[in-house]
């Protein structure tokens, strides 16, 4: 049905304007507007057409993207060639097919967007804005042409690994940041996996959540949570020598949780090269993946199937089916470099396509 709708739309667009330069220009601007491309310019000169084509292929940076650690690659030669063809009289229909992404999800969302624009029942302004934002995000992904990409969508609390053509080769539920500690939107690389990681407790969690508990009974609380006290030199400090009455903002130590199945990061951690203390990791509370609302973390991204994800990124089956549950206690952390660092992209698409191929509007708990 989706393909039929797209075919009808494209046929009418081309039939009504074929061979008419003014009509072709109108269709270009109208199509760009329909899929959420801003009105860039008014005259069909080379510079203006180039700007439209660049956004139709590569989109614009999504709103609230806080950090971009991945290099963007835009094929300017391709855009220039398409511009010359358009200005030389090539019909819009043939150019559109070469411009638009062949990603199944993008095609499905484009058809849905066209239906929203002509159907008053479906096409409320909020829905149209949401689908256009998601279409832009998919176009923007074309700037990152790696063989493998890890993509996390915050509203759906899902992670997927896609290939160069956008096909999903792996997916997993995740837990993302809660409204008070949201996961930021960014792009970066995953360079390595840590086996049996320490959890170096963030300062904010130490001050706001842990110190008040520890002060009541330092030895018992630290022992129950497998926490170590570390000084500025990275040395472990005997808790009995610490003045726990020191004001929280002047507390000179950091807390570190020992490795093992009880560690908050679980037994696998995926390092992420960004300015944030944000990474992907296993967890010691896997029951939360069954919840519909998985906006629960302090900002990091907990992965339901970290062993399978690690095997995929490493390129071989290093971790067996029972690896997550048969872990050693107090094992030393070990960092394993990936054969090639993998791009990771954090997005915020309220409207998207789920793993079953259905269009979903997800609970929008916060705006990052």
For the regions a language model picked out, list residue spans one by one.
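Well-ordered beta-sheet/strand-loop patches within structured domains
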Residues: 20-24, 33, 70, 74, ...
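Small-molecule-sensing regulatory modules
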Residues: 47, 81-82
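Cationic-aromatic interfacial patches
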Residues: 20-75
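Bacterial Sec-dependent N-terminal signal peptides
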Residues: 1-20
């Amino acid at each position: 049905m989706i393909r039929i709708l797209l075919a009808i739309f494209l046929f009418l667009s081309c039939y009504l304007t074929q061979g008419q330069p003014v009509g072709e220009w109108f269709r270009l601007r109208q199509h760009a507007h329909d899929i959420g491309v801003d009105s860039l310019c008014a005259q069909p000169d080379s510079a203006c057409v180039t700007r439209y084509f660049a956004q139709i292929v590569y989109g614009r940076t999504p709103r609230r993207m806080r950090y971009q650690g991945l290099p963007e690659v835009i094929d300017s030669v391709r855009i220039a060639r398409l511009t010359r063809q358009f200005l030389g009289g090539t019909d819009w229909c043939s150019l559109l097919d070469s411009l638009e992404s062949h990603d199944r999800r993008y095609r499905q969302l484009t058809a849905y967007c066209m239906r929203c624009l002509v159907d008053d029942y479906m096409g409320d302004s909020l829905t149209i804005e949401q689908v256009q934002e998601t279409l832009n995000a998919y176009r923007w992904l074309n700037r990152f042409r790696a063989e493998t990409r890890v993509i996390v969508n915050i509203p759906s609390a899902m992670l997927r690994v896609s290939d160069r053509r956008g096909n999903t080769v792996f997916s997993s539920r995740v837990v993302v940041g809660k409204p008070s500690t949201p996961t930021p939107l960014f792009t970066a690389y995953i360079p390595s996996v840590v086996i049996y990681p320490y959890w170096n407790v963030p300062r904010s969690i130490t001050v706001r959540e842990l110190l008040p508990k520890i002060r009541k009974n330092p030895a018992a609380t630290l022992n129950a949570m497998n926490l170590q006290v570390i000084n500025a030199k990275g040395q472990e400090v005997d808790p009995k020598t610490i003045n726990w009455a020191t004001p929280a903002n002047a507390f000179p130590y950091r807390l570190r949780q020992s490795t093992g199945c009880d560690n908050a990061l679980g037994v696998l951690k995926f390092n992420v090269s960004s300015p944030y203390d944000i990474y992907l990791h296993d967890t010691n509370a896997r029951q939360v993946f069954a919840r519909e609302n998985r906006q629960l973390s302090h900002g990091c991204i907990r992965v339901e199937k970290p062993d399978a994800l690690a095997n995929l990124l490493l390129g071989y089956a290093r971790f067996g089916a029972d690896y997550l549950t048969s872990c050693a206690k107090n094992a030393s952390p070990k960092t394993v470099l990936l054969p090639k660092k993998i791009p990771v992209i954090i997005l915020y698409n309220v409207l998207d396509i789920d793993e079953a191929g259905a269009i979903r509007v997800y609970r929008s708990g916060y705006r990052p």
